[in-house]
Amino acid sequence: KIFCFLMLLGLSASAATATIFPQCSQAPITSLLPPYLSPAVSSVCENPILQPYRIQQAIAAGILPLSPLFLQQPSALLQQLPLVHLLAQNIRAQQLQQLVLGNLAAYSQQHQFLPFNQLAALNSAAYLQQQLPFSQLAAAYPQQFLPFNQLAALNSAAYLQQQQLPPFSQLADVSPAAFLTQQQLLPFYLHAAPNAGTVLQLQQLLPFDQLALTNPTAFYQQPIIGGALF
């Protein structure tokens, strides 16, 4: 009797523990699944233990046919973007090359005049004020300014050094004729004294300047006489 009682007690306990598992309900699971999956997904609730695995397989089977649309097209688009950027760079390079080949002299002069372009971009008022005396003189004496234009095209550094000498700019405002004479004599000064400060000191010597204006030949002989005396 005691043995039968224990068997009945065990059966009742197993039955009680078996009833705590809920029955499979298809309605809430199917409502959570995406609408583009196949209808076979609704039949995955056969066993509560197999539910997660079956749902995972069903979702993978539903996404796999759609992968060319959702995965391959964005990756192909991302691969095409660098090609589009490279194509745009090639088009700009070809346009610049055509511009350079069409007018090589203007392109080289534009690069040699880069310091003046930077000054014009940073301070346009100072750039215009600096160029005003030379523009007036160039309009008055175009043939005499031709060597300076050639110097600017050949050696922009030397041209810029000439333009930065303020006494010449002041002299250009006061007396254009004297300024042109000074500019024609400037290569001899630069050959005799490479230092710009020494050149300015030589230019400030009034007797030599007056002699250069009246008699340039005698002025050229003055450094030789001075070198022989000292």
UniProtKB/Swiss-Prot annotation:
Zeins are major seed storage proteins. Coiled coil: none annotated. Keywords: Repeat, Seed storage protein, Signal, Storage protein. It comes from the Eukaryota. InterPro entries: Zein, Zein-alpha. Residues 1-18 form the signal peptide. This is Zein-alpha 19A2.
